[in-house]
Regions:
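Secondary-structure edge/capping motif, primarily at the C-terminal ends of alpha-helices
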Residues: 83, 119, 171-174
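Hydrophobic/aromatic-rich alpha-helical bundle segments in the mid-to-C-terminal region
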Residues: 127-131, 147-193, 197-199
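A secondary-structure capping/hinge motif
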Residues: 58-60, 115
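Hydrophobic alpha-helical connector segments
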Residues: 63, 67, 77-104, 147, ...
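Short hydrophobic/aromatic patch on the recognition helix
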Residues: 44-54
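Basic, helix-initiating cap at the start of DNA-binding domains
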Residues: 1-29, 33-45, 59
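Amphipathic alpha-helical segments used for helix-helix packing
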Residues: 103-124, 128
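Amphipathic alpha-helical packing segments from all-alpha helical-bundle domains
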Residues: 73, 89-92, 122-147, 158
Length: 199
């Protein structure tokens, strides 16, 4: 998710140019496997310029993760800010949108999860960025679960979170469309957490 465009518009600042180039490389090749020289060539910048904006590679990785988070927030806002659909329908819309990305053969997995896999226990700033992103995702689902009037919103939110993470991991590894009806599964999960007597 959150990787809808890699194109670099003419109006990009040098900082954004570097971040977008690094994002594409980190997404496809991983973090350790992507060297500084390749980032410089892809962004068409000098080493002096790179280190002017990002003194260390870890600084650049944190900036890329922050941009990834902001991009996903912006994408999700198209669903979250709608006033014409219920909390339940917003949850379903999030999963439908996610499935579209997961079914794409070019999906390389969640950047935050990939970063955590490479830097867990090695770089606290990167770990913190990854945790912040996932905690935000969980909080979005918790808010929507409450809006949907779930009996136990925290419980429902975490189940939805696990399902979303599982879908992402399966898509990254199997490289094939999900063979089951995710919308139906999510709908049934939500319904199982509603108090029908109050509806």
């Amino acid at each position: 998710m959150a990787d809808k465009k890699d194109n670099k518009p003419q109006s990009l600042t040098k900082n954004d140019q570097i971040v977008q180039a690094a994002f594409s490389l980190f997404k496809e090749n991983g973090f350790y496997a992507t060297g500084v020289d390749l980032i410089m060539r892809t962004a068409n910048i000098s080493k002096r310029t790179l280190y002017k904006y990002f003194p260390t590679k870890n600084d650049l990785i944190v900036a890329v993760l922050k941009n990834y988070h902001m991009s996903y927030q912006k994408s999700l806002s198209l669903i979250l800010e709608r006033n014409d659909i219920s909390g339940k329908d917003k949850i379903l819309a999030i999963f439908e949108d996610a499935k579209g990305w997961f079914d794409n053969p070019a999906f390389y997995g969640c950047l935050a999860v990939n970063a955590m896999g490479e830097f867990s226990g090695k770089a606290q700033d990167i770990e913190d960025s990854c945790k912040h992103f996932k905690q935000w995702e969980l909080e979005v689902l918790r808010t929507l679960a409450k809006d949907a009037q779930a009996i136990q919103p925290d419980d429902l939110a975490f189940k939805l979170f696990l399902l979303l993470e599982g879908m992402s991991s399966a898509a990254q590894v199997l490289k094939r469309p999900c063979p089951i009806d995710i919308t139906k599964m999510v709908d049934e999960l939500i319904e199982s957490h509603l108090n029908k007597k109050t509806l």
